[in-house]
Amino acid sequence: MMSSAVCRLAPSPTGAQHLGNARTFLIAYWSARAQNARLILRIEDIDSPRIKPWATEQAITDLRWLGMDWDGDPIVQTERSPLYDEARNQLMDADRVYPCSCTRRDIEAAASAPHESEASGWTPDAPVYPGTCASWKNGDPLPEDKPFCFRFRMQATPDRFFDRVHGEVACNPIQDIGDFPITRKAESAADCLAAYQLAVVVDDIDAGVTEVVRGDDLILSTFRQLQLYEALGHSPPSHAHVPLVTGTDGRRLAKRHGDTRLSHFREQGMPPETIVRWAAKSSGLCPDSDAALSERTLDQIHQQMIDRFDWVRIHRQPTVVDDFGSTTD
């Protein structure tokens, strides 16, 4: 019997899915099935300038190749603009957003260089906005002479949440993050299309998502989204930020680390069981000493991980990959 929990797989078709993506999706999948949750597939294609036309179909193929399934048809962000516009208007009425015509160069020139916050230990993931346009109030005229986006007003109250992998995490939202854009730039409000931060919150609210699983490079994004949930009048889901898969240089996987695309391994004839076994062991869900894992079928491996699933088993440290194809069983 399906529970009331709702989880999601949310690939972004900005390129090929790689080993790091696979492990995060597998952990999310095992957690969802362990809860008997409804699992949705959402295609996060809102960042249209970076979207690759072939990447959506390939991502779905990759997920199915690894033995994952989901409930219902895929949800596609680019088909949901009216929902995002409605949420933006709600935020405007509450004076939680304002138009901003600053360029990235303007922001970098006005803001101090990214630094480690003495208050919380975070290194900002983008230049902290200095508030140049923040004096705008709802009802003031919109900019007419240059493109603008809508920027969300962060509240100064210190933010914290419990992460299922890392425990309690906290930040100073003004010092570590600052006001952030919820739309892309355009010449008019009607043409300001939703950006990632707003879209994912609206989508999760609409689907009733109760658990979000993603890489721990997105923890600062979670602080942004927690304030969006509050401003839109909804309680947030629980969060689990899993460690990244990195190269030997400590940086997350990229082309410089060799070809770690799932499609590459599939084309080379690697069985999906190899990747799923690696994800099970490297995540901490399955001990390295479990030699019997190599004898199990794909469905059997999935069922074992679903039966064993517990967030306390998930490692907190990144997994380093070096020449994956030659080091796996």
Curated annotation (Swiss-Prot):
It is an enzyme of class 6 (ligase). Zn(2+) binds at residues 100, 102, 129, 133. Binds 1 zinc ion per subunit. Its EC number is 6.1.1.-. ATP binds at residue 255. A motif ('HIGH' region) lies at residues 11-21. GO terms for biological process: glutamyl-tRNA aminoacylation; tRNA modification. One of its GO terms (cellular component) is cytosol. Transmembrane segments: none annotated. InterPro entries: Glu-Q_tRNA(Asp)_Synthase (IPR022380), Glu/Gln-tRNA-synth (IPR000924), Glu/Gln-tRNA-synth_Ib_cat-dom (IPR020058), GluQ/Sye (IPR049940), Rossmann-like_a/b/a_fold (IPR014729). This is Glutamyl-Q tRNA(Asp) synthetase. It comes from Rhodopirellula baltica (strain DSM 10527 / NCIMB 13988 / SH1). The gene is gluQ.
